[in-house]
């Protein structure tokens, strides 16, 4: 659990022949959109509502990458990303609330996903040299819950709003988790690709919902490569191609293709899946988007020099991917990424990610506006 987001060691590209030359990114602007520099912000997801408004869900209120203070927040923009609201806290459990995904259903409901973690307790157990005030702060946060209460709170969660996010349901348990949450399929179903986190099996696969996100049912498991440990598959995301194939990307930490994105496909609506295979892309995790012209876009963090965020385009439904398009390359280190992209009505792209910047005390949310040339 603690190594899931460790800065990754260098690894050579695999299956280089599957990567072909293609378009480039024309980046118009990059800006910081979070407004509370006293807090660490992490692992956002960007969504666009039916009126064109933008919403970002993320883990906010934090002290560090791992801490007991994480909560789920949302910020909004009604002008294409130029200005952003003050954060709305929608979940603040007594333990760490982490990566936040967001999906807007065909009915207009908002679904936000997250998971809780006790990883901060391992950090705290080795914090003997901390200042007394920080030790007391973490201890008091931890003592809000008993061991039994912590065990109850440790799970994968979803919240639902049917009034545009003014009010939210209580969090309810879902069978799996991934950073960027569910997607909408052409048949109206909601599909959630992810991983079981706090179970003994660590199964990866997809669930679907046919009732606007109220309930979720396990649909299909993704097989494991013969040499792989399923526990080293992480942070899945899905997209549906124009022809109905579903493509899923997987963050891989196995010895074969370490630090690369693996891909699996389904041609029967998510019931069965191909064995994951490398696509020649180092960097993760990947968020997938189908562009209006039918091409697929993958956005992913790049945690080695040049530190930043990249994207690639597929013109053939995920069979091959272009060379990288640089969204940002000015990062100070590896604590960045989880980019999430939407396409505006004018065809331009907005990508949001988190990043620890050298001139900021804590990680912030950054936004790029850009276009694909070619």
Where does each model-flagged region fall?
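N-terminal secretory signal peptides and thylakoid transit peptides that target proteins
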Residues: 1-12
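Asp-box/BNR beta-propeller blade signature and adjacent active/binding-site loops
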Residues: 22-374
